[in-house]
Amino acid sequence: MEFHFDATFFAFVGLILFLALVVYLKVPGMMARSLDDRADQIRNELAEAKRLREEAQHLLAEYQRKRKEAEAEAAHIVAAAEREAEMLTAEAKKKTEEFVANRTALSEQKIKQAEADAMKAVRSAAVDLAIAAAETVLAKKADGKVQSELFGNAVGQVKTRLN
């Protein structure tokens, strides 16, 4: 049996020695551990990403709920403001109508009072004129006896009216 020590043989021996050295230094275990660590790290990152995604979805749902609540509250506030504005408008209209009615009634009352005062003044002036005319007529036509009798009758009428 003859051995040929050519380059192929030495390459094979080198390969065997290299593999023995790799096994002796526990390189496959270190590689497996490194790959396991990397797999664990990736698994943890995926779990963290899933947790963050769920948290983001929860926050999104919460913000959407809060937005809907805020929109509902804003709609409620707007509706309340509209109702209050309508009430204030109706109240202002009612007060304005009452004010106009009061002013109209007061003006009508003043007009009636002015008419009554004018009628009294006209009557008083007519009475004064009639008295003056009667006095003038009586002064010209009546003598002393008739004047005394008229004066007595007038005083008697005044006494009866005062009592």
UniProtKB/Swiss-Prot annotation:
GO MF annotations in UniProt: proton-transporting ATP synthase activity, rotational mechanism; proton-transporting ATPase activity, rotational mechanism
HAMAP family, A to Z: ATP_synth_b_bprime
GO cellular component, one term: proton-transporting ATP synthase complex
Pfam families: ATP-synt_B
Stated name of the protein: ATP synthase subunit b 1
UniProt cross-references to PANTHER family, sorted A to Z: ATP SYNTHASE SUBUNIT B, ATP SYNTHASE SUBUNIT B', CHLOROPLASTIC
Membrane-spanning intervals of the chain: 5-25
Keyword terms, alphabetized: ATP synthesis, Cell inner membrane, Cell membrane, CF(0), Hydrogen ion transport, Ion transport, Membrane, Transmembrane, Transmembrane helix, Transport
Lineage: Bacteria, Pseudomonadati, Pseudomonadota, Alphaproteobacteria, Hyphomicrobiales
Location(s), subcellular: Cell inner membrane
Family per similarity comment: Belongs to the ATPase B chain family.
Superkingdom field: Bacteria
